[in-house]
Amino acid sequence: MSIPGLGQIAPQAPTTTQRTINLRPFGEWRFSIPHQHSTFSSNSSAAGVTVRLVAGTAERDGTELAPNCVYTFLPGTKSKLFTDQGCTLEINNTGGYPLEDRVVEHPPEQSPMLSYINLHFGLQDHERAAAAQAQQQHPTHHQQQQQGRGAGAGVARSKPGPRVLICGPPGVGKTSLAKLLAALATRMGSQPLVANLNPTDGLLCLPGTLGAAVFGTLMDVEEPAGGFGVTNTPISGPSAVPVKNPLTFYFGHEKVEDDVDMWRQMTERLAVLARRKFERNRDVRVAGLLVDTAPVEAGDKEGQELLGWAVRQFDANFVVVLGSEQLKTELGQRFASEKTSFEEPITVLGLDKSDGAVQIDKAWRQKSTETAIKEYFFGGIKARLSPFTQSASFDELVVFKAPDEPYEGAPVLERVEITPEMAHWTLAVMIASVTDSPQAIRFSSVLGFIVIADVDQERRRVKFLSPVSGRLGNHPLIWGRWPEPYLNLLA
């Protein structure tokens, strides 16, 4: 059937979303992609904003982009691409995301990146000095045989590489600097140990945790956390980049001040394990340590006291203060007379924050937390995972919880009954036994996480989501106070 006039309607030209950006040396392309809304399907072929490096060099937080390779940046990403030599980028937003972006170009001498790169080279000098001392005090097995010495000879304690603690007020780019220094170190063949003491941001794990991991391989530039996210850990399938194996403690709170005593004890425990890593792995010992911390402002005496605690526990010999000259002055006075266990002075360095660093608002952080939980169980765009829905009786699960209001003499954990209030909460599965003491369970490392999907009080059964099949065995669970149950993963 013919409809008059229909054939005269000209076909609508497709809207082009592709554009080209030219950056001069030390230029940046800064971008923000809002978190995914229901109008955008994660199954769409246009899952995010794609970027291709056409010419020149570019990097994200120290990790280089390969030429002519298409990178997809996903919703929930706030970041930048930097070039030290100049580059041409091809940007494509066929998914129609409300992309916010701009080009920023500084003269090299005015770019904060110059000071960050200079810091990296300064740390490399200390690493080379540590390597030379380690080589002298700990010859290789072949060298020992040539010198007629036994394999156990030369075990004198050598000085490790630089131990750097990064601090500053909120929104100055502390985590971005930690990523940058870690990525630049790995590009030089180093294997630094990176530790996170800020429970608001999990390192290779869910928020609400403290942890550490060795970074000796390429970091994932595409994922929203830029190499520090949960998708960079081992999964049941192929991975686009080499995975990292974090050591994680479950803090269970959003902020350090929610339980300062617990934070101190976990920081001390993490530092002990870091020293053991130094003792067992020569390459890590030489590369040193990067410690990312929770926000601390000038005049915050309690926060600065906690920084001092972390400096002493990790034996840091460099304290990098971002974005606050006053805080740098106060910490310089605090550490002026202190030395490390190797009789090194504690050097306090002040660096300007990038004018692109912004403070993350509560709504964005909440969506980021939800996304991290989803990706832990279901994977991301590049690697889909299929979690297992399991059912167990109340008697099969042993759940502990920290007191809601910590008080002097309070137990670190109390065993609790399973209740409907647990629905949609994320519980930590501990590397411990249900017969261990509450103290041992609390300070055990994390095996993984489950989400309580439903609690049937009448039948005394609980349904939960787990990344692996099989029973939990005698592993105890800890029910924290954060992350809160924002969503129903099985909805």
From Swiss-Prot:
Comp. bias intervals (Low complexity): 130-148
Entries under HAMAP family matching the protein: Clp1 (MF_03035)
Biological role stated in the UniProt entry: Required for endonucleolytic cleavage during polyadenylation-dependent pre-mRNA 3'-end formation.
Family: Belongs to the Clp1 family. Clp1 subfamily.
UniProt GO molecular function: ATP binding; ATP hydrolysis activity; polynucleotide 5'-hydroxyl-kinase activity
Localization per Swiss-Prot or TrEMBL: Nucleus
Protein's GO biological process: mRNA 3'-end processing; tRNA splicing, via endonucleolytic cleavage and ligation
Protein name according to UniProt: mRNA cleavage and polyadenylation factor clp1
Binding locations of ATP: E28, K78, G171, V172, G173, K174, T175, S176
GO cellular component terms given for this protein: mRNA cleavage factor complex; nucleus
Coiled coil segments of this chain: none
Lineage: superkingdom: Eukaryota
Keywords of this entry: ATP-binding, mRNA processing, Nucleotide-binding, Nucleus
Subunit structure: Component of a pre-mRNA cleavage factor complex. Interacts directly with PCF11.
Gene3D superfamilies: Clp1, DNA binding domain, P-loop containing nucleotide triphosphate hydrolases, Pre-mRNA cleavage complex subunit Clp1, C-terminal domain
Region of interest called Disordered, as start-end residue ranges on this chain: 128-160
